[in-house]
Amino acid sequence: MFDVLSDDLMQKMDAYWRAANYLSVGQIYLQDNPLLEQPLRIEHIKPRLLGHWGTTPGLNLLYVHLNRLISAHDLDMIYIIGPGHGGPGLVANSYLEGSYTERYPAIERNRNGLQRLFRQFSWPNGVPSHVSPETPGSIHEGGELGYSLAHAYGAAFDNPDLIVACIVGDGEAETGALATSWHSNKFLNPARDGAVLPILHLNGFKIANPTILARIGRQELTDLMRGYGYEPIVVEGDDPKLVHHTLAAALERALADIRAIQAAARHQGVTVRPRWPMIILRTPKGWTGPKQVDGKQIEGTWRAHQVPIASFKDPTHVQLLETWLRSYRPEELFDASGKFRDDLAALAPTGHRRMSANPHANGGELLQPLSLPDFHDYAVTQSGPGTVKAEATRVLGAFLRDVMKSNLDAKNFRLFGPDETASNRLDAVLEVTDKEWMAEIEDVDVALGPDGRVMEVLSEHLCQGWLEGYLLTGRHGFFSCYEAFIHIVGSMFNQHAKWLKTCDAIPWRRPIASLNYLLTSHVWRQDHNGLSHQDPGFIDHVVNKKASVVRVYLPPDANCLLSVADHCLRSRNYVNLIVAGKQPEWQWLDIDSAVRHCSAGAGIWHWASNGEDDPDVVMACAGDVPTLETLAAVMLLREYVPDIRVRVVNVVDLMVLQPSSEHPHGLDDKRFDEIFTVDKPVVFAFHGYPWLIHRLTYRRRNHFNIHVRGYKEEGSTTTPFDMVVLNDLDRYRLALDAIRRIPRLAGEVEAATARYWATMQRHKLYIGEHGDDMPEVRDWSWQG
């Protein structure tokens, strides 16, 4: 490799690296004496030592070298740190660049500011130990490992001038999500997207074990990366001077390769999938730290992972820490006031070219609203409730097609899914765009192309990670998935929800577009795939998160789905969960009624009720199939008990069930009581696990009267109606539940129970003989 560093520049870069390392160690250890102007004493050291040193010097090394590359070539670049436990490093570098003080003026660029910077790290009411939202320049906390590379590619999509430097920890590289993320290069189009520069940080160890990639040999490792479609550039060593020179040359080569790839695609029309560069950086874990502590090797081992000197009961450890800190020669790095030397600070880029101040790392600054068609234009027309059937997601697909079409020029909307866009009946979008694909295309393939905006790969992890990276850098997206398999990204959802919750309290973090899930092919219509495909529990998982972040919608029909989807696409800083079926189902509300109903979140369906001013029972429902079964149960009740008074309540926004003190969408007690009454039995048919409704309503006055039916982990490959029968959610069970709970009908219970069991026997015999549901179920329609 050619030498790109003069001796003077190399010396200054090494000093900058020493400064970042000094600040990183100071954050972990010191609460006073930040410039070591006094001999170090035990009272200068924090009582609780928290943080991770091992990865940090490598992260700092890369940061100073990327800064040189940015300044030399005027690059637009952001920095994603997979091993986010190296939080002190990014805090240190954002402080050295000045952006940290711009965001937090109390952390001045002097002695007092340094002391505050050190003391606040991993301190109560201070800042967390990882690369959290509080850290300027971060879009990826890296607490839970595995998602850095997917986030990096998501950030690069539709950002043609952006380079995303993504540091992948060699421990992180062992996760399933990261392992499949290498394939993201098959979806990156150099003609219109930015570039991702993966840098595998090969320091050899995790918390207590070696890493796989560090122990398979150089040839096998480079072969692996080539097999993934990359051209690896190896930088290795433990001599700082040598590593500075080889790393600078490696980055120049990588940039030249990136520019050549993009020029070929953008100016010469080359469409062949390129072999993108990536860097393998092999340096010691805990580099520049203590060689040994108490006779045990630290640098270059797993013992450097967290706090190398973990206890100061031995007085010699204070001297050991002081020696370590003074090895960075802080007196050469900071002036008498504690300010970073001007000639060293000048190495960093300025303004928005600083990675810690790049607007792509605060995507809300760049966010533009979507151009949305009028969803009313896609409404299902009907002459009355239950007079027409429609496939809700197919109706939504037509709307999303035109959302896609309306934003093609803006290049700020993509649809994500794990090979399910057509299955989930959203394939109308393929009328205006392809599925993105940079790999080989054969004659049999349909709607594949390098310019597609539908992102399909059979990895929920990649779909979620790409979408998060896309949203965090200021764009919009929509993720559709089979309901049962969204659990695969349950932990990723956790991390994104936590990120949003934290951002709400950080004034400089601008709101981003919401993460919108559409869960379909749901539990009640997975009769053809069986028990493995039947699980509505993601709703429970989402509800556990902060009320300021999560929203859950269960539209009962296509028009309600349109209204909900339009609302979600306009929203900011939420995770919106929509659950809707794809099979033909009866439609209940015209579009204007649907909008009113969705705006309220829950309400009485007067057209399905009678005697509702003084009902015998409230028949409540949430979800499309529970709504169908509830309305069918109402018809049965009128047949069984002609003078029965029934109020039908439908819930589309699940969070209205919580009190308004617990969730901003929650109904106040007065309105809840108006809908659900204060003393009447409520039979609640719910899409998911029944105990969730009890959790949401336990503070309500009439909670003791609420009886919930829902999924109770019964299912198989069977008929659609048998699915609800197996879980006691069928119309016959709901009708029996109502009769049992109406005091004046006590004399009817025995006959009603016998009728129910006779019907169940008839149902079982019929499906066993015919393999289909009884005509009275299959051909049912609403008779108002």
Curated annotation (Swiss-Prot):
The keyword Lyase is annotated on this UniProt entry: yes
Sequence similarity: Belongs to the XFP family.
GO MF terms held by the record: aldehyde-lyase activity
Keywords: Lyase, Thiamine pyrophosphate
Cofactor names: thiamine diphosphate
Organism encoding this protein: Rhodopseudomonas palustris (strain BisB5)
Alphabetized NCBIfam families for the sequence: PRK05261.1-1, PRK05261.1-2, PRK05261.1-4, PRK05261.1-6
HAMAP family: Phosphoketolase
Enzyme Commission number(s) from the entry: 4.1.2.-
This protein's name: Probable phosphoketolase
InterPro entries: Phosphoketolase (IPR023962), THDP-binding (IPR029061), Transketo_C/PFOR_II (IPR009014), Xul5P/Fru6P_PKetolase (IPR005593), Xul5P/Fru6P_PKetolase_C (IPR018969), Xul5P/Fru6P_PKetolase_CS (IPR019790), Xul5P/Fru6P_PKetolase_N (IPR018970), Xul5P/Fru6P_PKetolase_ThDP_BS (IPR019789)
